[in-house]
């Protein structure tokens, strides 16, 4: 993550950063909610979300349609049928300190108006570390069970839910005709340890932690597997109810108990921040002895009428907040440091540890974040260890399970350091493809520059290459890319972009099983795939540049370069000429080509350095050569036809359902006539083109007095009627 403070970001940098954060947070949402295998801690995830929110607060007109601030969870997994929740399953805001809790309580009082101190009751309940579930009953009979999914649509796991003994299949007489009980499916620590002992005895790989195991168990296609896992449930909330049997949160908890649902015995009704914090600390002291994982305490306004008055923000209720626990710690020996290469080329140091139990989980690896963290330097250049020491192999280290997910080393027991311990030297070369690794100014992370050739990044790079705004090859989605990348037959393999364009020829020459005879394909779909590939042998220059996956060269910057250089030959020539003659240097500021690169509108030194790094790496140039040999030709950008255009230099927003063109076609047309496009309406907007169904953007335009026209008027305006 970049170190540039939010208040110092320029608008182009903010656009780039919001694009990166949207992509990165979506990736981690997918890992956590859909795949049950998170790769970063809760704290690191929360930091990404907070940075995204801070940038959006400073640049509200840059909020993306795919912004993490507008999304809950992730889309449901395709192997299960989808269930639309009658009432959305929203996430909660987080508190990380006593002050955060006091601020939350204060905000409730301020919103509700003048009230006596401590007059509002709150419930406080342990935050179970499991999988959120909504269970629907109609006329007392269990009808469906669904995961939270993206908050609006979840996965139908009804068959598996029925195997959980603690969830009643039938409600007692007198229950409302429609009831949705919400709660958390989890696995007890004792059952988790027993399962791992069984797996080890059978010579199978053991599981990482109870939360992931519970989530994976619930998503089994075979309900017998789910039944064997001894899953449990705590009820704590509700969705649709045809009639409310209580008027307080605590009253509903008691109703759940009467209906036969387990409710957490540590739930209490309290008043004021002091009582909430005292209960939080009491639960924290009991945490290690509990037979289930918890990662905090949830506070809710008790009276339901006050909950209704307080209402909701876009993704979370105003009447509730989750107070997170700090991570648990233990001491062990650092045996080694390995370097892993992530899907985006980031080099991450990983500590290999003498096995140690932290919070009930055996830990053998821990993240070391980056070079600076090993040296004891924080994100803002501050020293993060009191006596300014680094981390060395052989050290006795303090390990923390941050967010109960990814362990990290937080400190060193310096008195136990051996006399011959030496500082760790961070590599400047990718351990996977041996391309040079660079660390951009203002960043803490080294990144491999062999993006198109590095095996660690290959699948992600190919997915990006064929994505909608790049080569847009229909029939090459995520699953197909995974299939071709891992294919054992060389005539089917797609390891680099050039392989896409030689696939048909290689298949024609193959004596082995043909693609159309492989399950999941067929003659028709294979023909469509080949046609889609061949249709992209000639590709618009900006799409080609975006498809290369050069760091910081997103869709917007790719268009800027295309408009500035007009041909790929001119762009490549400038990039190669800007490569410094001295190995190890990243820029040659006296170089004319370098000055030309940074002079492109909206392009600064950070983006230009990324371009130069890409072209300085011989492996990338080799991949490009192979791409051209395979018959790919970037089509020269047409110079803007906007001379005298009435929209030249204006900012245009398209909204509603366009009937004569797609949204992408509309944006391309506007840019062709010299206009800029935006995704939201602000004071900087000059024109709004509204189709049927235009909503909030149309209202905002009217409020700001911005000109609004329909689609037909747009075509007339630009002279294409």
Curated annotation (Swiss-Prot):
SUPFAM superfamilies for this protein: BRCT domain, DNA ligase/mRNA capping enzyme, catalytic domain, Nucleic acid-binding proteins, RuvA domain 2-like
Recorded catalytic activity of this chain's protein: NAD(+) + (deoxyribonucleotide)n-3'-hydroxyl + 5'-phospho-(deoxyribonucleotide)m = (deoxyribonucleotide)n+m + AMP + beta-nicotinamide D-nucleotide
EC number of this enzyme: 6.5.1.2
Domain BRCT, residue spans: 642-721
Any one biological process term the GO annotation gives: DNA replication
Cofactors demanded by this protein: Mg(2+); Mn(2+)
Record's keyword terms, sorted: DNA damage, DNA repair, DNA replication, Ligase, Magnesium, Manganese, Metal-binding, NAD, Zinc
Pfam families with a match to the protein in the record: BRCT (PF00533), DNA_ligase_aden (PF01653), DNA_ligase_OB (PF03120), DNA_ligase_ZBD (PF03119), HHH_2 (PF12826)
UniProt GO MF annotations: DNA binding; DNA ligase (NAD+) activity; metal ion binding
Gene3D superfamilies: 5' to 3' exonuclease, C-terminal subdomain (1.10.150.20), 6.20.10.30, BRCT domain (3.40.50.10190), DNA ligase/mRNA capping enzyme (3.30.470.30), Helix hairpin bin (1.10.287.610), Nucleic acid-binding proteins (2.40.50.140)
Superkingdom of the source species: Bacteria
Any one GO cellular component localisation term in the record: cytosol
Active site location: 127
Binding sites annotated in the UniProt record for Zn(2+): 430, 433, 448, 454
Database matches in InterPro entries: BRCT_dom, BRCT_dom_sf, DisA/LigA_HHH, DNA_ligase, DNA_ligase_AS, DNA_ligase_CS, DNAligase_adenylation, DNAligase_N
UniProt: NAD(+) binding residues: 42-46, 91-92, 125, 148, 184, 300, 324
NCBIfam families: dnlj, PRK07956.1
General function of this protein: DNA ligase that catalyzes the formation of phosphodiester linkages between 5'-phosphoryl and 3'-hydroxyl groups in double-stranded DNA using NAD as a coenzyme and as the energy source for the reaction. It is essential for DNA replication and repair of damaged DNA.
Family assignment from sequence similarity: Belongs to the NAD-dependent DNA ligase family. LigA subfamily.
This protein's name: DNA ligase
Organism: Brucella anthropi (strain ATCC 49188 / DSM 6882 / CCUG 24695 / JCM 21032 / LMG 3331 / NBRC 15819 / NCTC 12168 / Alc 37) (Ochrobactrum anthropi)
